[in-house]
Swiss-Prot record:
Heterodimer with srp72. Srp68-srp72 heterodimer formation is stabilized by the presence of 7SL RNA. Component of a fungal signal recognition particle (SRP) complex that consists of a 7SL RNA molecule (scR1) and at least six protein subunits: srp72, srp68, srp54, sec65, srp21 and srp14. One of its GO terms (biological process) is SRP-dependent cotranslational protein targeting to membrane. The keyword Lyase does not apply. This is Signal recognition particle subunit srp68. Keywords: Cytoplasm, Nucleus, Ribonucleoprotein, RNA-binding, Signal recognition particle. Coiled coil: none annotated. Gene3D superfamilies: Signal recognition particle, SRP68 subunit, RNA-binding domain. It comes from Schizosaccharomyces pombe (strain 972 / ATCC 24843). The keyword Membrane does not apply. Belongs to the SRP68 family. Pfam families: SRP68. InterPro entries: SRP68, SRP68_N_sf. One of its GO terms (cellular component) is signal recognition particle, endoplasmic reticulum targeting. Residues 566-597 are annotated as: Disordered.
Length: 597
């Protein structure tokens, strides 16, 4: 398509987004935005972007909200200021700026954007002030709830037949209402509001392909938060709601006369039908099968953890988007079961045995999910064949080996010889793959080192064969499907070893002759041609060890340690003794000397 035509069509899409609902133009042959794409043609009569315009007409609120939250990467007060600027700009464009504190409204569809941003701004202020100023934060949350209800009323009055527009508004407004009831400890009201919000999100899930990837991630986080809040509120409302799946809990908490039911029936009526198969599947959530053992879990905390795993598995979204949440749910269930098991005495042996089997089952699945997540991340990696990719593969296999070692130490596996043998085979296969990754890294630099690592990898594969030779069970898929991987690695490794052996031998042939040292050539006869270069006395593989000659030892024995033979020994200085001098007699006078004599 001509890029000018594409650009002009995009401008037409943007322009028609802000047309009023009663817009009519005979040249286009349409009466609202949802049918513009079907009539937009070029000079030859070809329809341009009909599907794209129709998809943009489906969603109105979600793209605005997700764009504001994700495109600009604002946080805290910056995002609140951004919403204030957006609200002020919309009011100026609609000529409804407030003067004197009197609010004004409009019948234009863009007025829904003002209500949406006002509600989101008040809600973000609640989140920002929640920990420091709770009373003020609750006032902002009530204000957000008021704007949300006004948004729902506006969408219903604007076009009661636009079901997607209404469901977008009710999903956002009921989420705020559920949060308000949650803060007020009104569990019944919070359960009903969160259920309506979740139902609206599930209906809109079929249309989510029209959003961008980053918008899908933001919307997925909002849905996950609704699911976790709904499960917690169900736990606080009573035991009758704790053992229900989120779908059954959601449908049982919504009154039949709710207006949202009519809109849901108009868009997707099948979502309101609960089949018997799902009812039966709920009975198997608390039944665990592990290594020919089947137990039923009855402890309430462990049961709730198992239902949380079931909720994440059945939540909307792809497997890749749910992988981290599923791993967190399994880890949480393992932690709860471990705590309950530690507090359980050995008096009730049956209960202790049941919890031990449950703990082994959960811990093993946590290890399994970690390995699968690491493998999926490595497969999705965009690194080209380089040293960085080889290092990443080596760290991946190190992580797999550590996780399998953790699984081997679990109480229910350490005494199971069959499961231990499978884990040992998986460890040996992972070590073989790690050696192959190291060999690939050394192949360009050192062929012999690469060949040595390949030989070691082959020895690990031989260990796998030895383990599986007497193994009668069908191996489980833990990190690898071990039998196909073993056959493939053996075939590739043989080719690689032959290639490296040939490359190493060619390198030895092309290598220049080594200049041997004198010690290395003493026991061989060399021709004159071989002796043309000077003898190498230093670069020898056999190094001389410095030692004192024998006559030095004899001389030291008879003469003592001599530092210098041409100099006389220095005479030791005698200690100086102090000699006391007699004091001189004073000269006497004439008469004194005469008398003295």
């Amino acid at each position: 398509m001509d890029p000018h035509v594409k650009l002009s069509t995009s401008l037409v899409i943007i322009a028609f987004r802000y047309l009023p609902n009663n817009f009519n133009d005979s040249r286009l042959g349409c009466d609202n935005l949802s049918t513009v794409g079907l009539c937009l043609k070029n000079g030859t009569g070809e329809v341009l972007f009909s599907g794209l315009i129709k998809q943009m007409a489906n969603f109105y609120i979600f793209p605005l909200l997700l764009e504001a939250r994700s495109d600009h990467f604002y946080e805290g007060n910056e995002y609140i200021k951004y919403l204030s600027h957006r609200i002020h700009g919309l009011r100026k464009s609609l000529h409804i700026t407030q003067r004197g504190g009197k609010p004004k409204s409009s019948v234009d569809k863009r007025y829904a954007e003002i209500l949406l941003f006002n509600a989101d701004r008040a809600f973000q202020q609640f989140v920002f002030l929640r920990s420091s100023q709770r009373r003020h934060a609750l006032r902002r949350l009530k204000r957000a709830d008021q704007f949300g209800k006004e948004l729902v009323s506006f969408t219903n009055a604007f076009d009661c037949n636009d079901h997607i527009f209404y469901l977008e508004a009710i999903a956002f407004a009921k989420y705020i209402e559920g949060t308000l009831n949650y803060e007020k400890r009104d569990w019944e009201g919070s359960l009903s509001a969160f259920s309506i919000s979740r139902l609206s999100f599930l209906v809109l899930q079929n249309k989510i392909d029209t959003l961008a990837e980053h918008e899908k991630s933001v919307l997925g986080e909002l849905q996950n938060q609704i699911d976790s809040n709904l499960r917690y509120v169900a736990q606080r409302t009573g035991l009758q709601n704790q053992t229900k799946s989120l779908d059954i809990l959601m449908l049982s908490s919504i009154p039949k006369d709710e207006e949202v039911i009519q809109h849901v029936n108009s868009v997707d009526s099948e979502i309101l039908q609960m089949t018997g198969d799902e009812q039966d599947s709920l009975q198997t959530i608390t039944v665990i099968e592990w290594r020919d053992q089947r137990v039923k879990i009855e402890h309430p905390d462990v049961v709730l953890a198992l239902y949380a795993i079931h909720d994440v598995k059945n939540s909307p979204g792809t497997i890749d988007s749910k992988r981290d949440r599923l791993l967190a749910a399994w880890a949480r269930a393992e932690e709860i079961t471990k705590s309950v098991l530690d507090n359980t005495g050995l008096e009730d042996e049956q209960k202790f045995q049941t919890l031990s089997i449950c703990y082994t089952y959960l811990a093993y699945n946590v290890v399994l999910l970690r390995i699968q997540r690491d493998l999926a991340v490595e497969n999705d990696s965009e690194l080209v064949a380089s040293q960085a990719q080889l290092r990443s593969r080596q760290s991946l296999y190190d992580s797999i080996i550590k996780n399998i070692e953790i699984a081997k130490e679990l109480p229910g596996i350490a005494r199971d010889t069959g499961m231990t043998a499978q884990l040992e085979a998986q460890i040996s296969l992972a070590k073989s793959k790690r050696c192959q990754a190291i060999a690939d890294a050394y192949q360009a630099q050192d062929k012999l080192a690469s060949l040595a690592m390949c030989v070691r990898a082959a020895s690990y594969l031989q260990q796998v064969n030895d383990i599986l030779r007497n193994f009668e069970e069908k191996p489980h898929l833990i990190a690898f499907d071990i039998i196909p991987e073993l056959k493939k690695d053996e075939k590739e490794l043989k080719k690689k070893i032959l290639l490296l052996q040939s490359l190493a031998s060619m390198g030895n042939i092309n290598q220049p002759p080594k200049n041997l040292s004198l010690v290395e050539t003493l026991d061989s006869y060399q021709t004159l041609a071989e002796l043309e270069p000077s003898w190498n006395l230093t670069d020898a593989d056999i190094r001389a060890i410095p030692a004192k000659p024998l006559f030095f030892d004899l001389a030291i024995t008879y003469l003592g340690q001599q530092t210098s033979f041409d100099k006389k020994k220095a005479q030791p200085e005698k200690p100086v003794t102090s000699v006391s001098k007699e004091p001189k007699q004073k000269n006497k006078g004439f008469f004194s000397s005469l008398l003295g004599r």
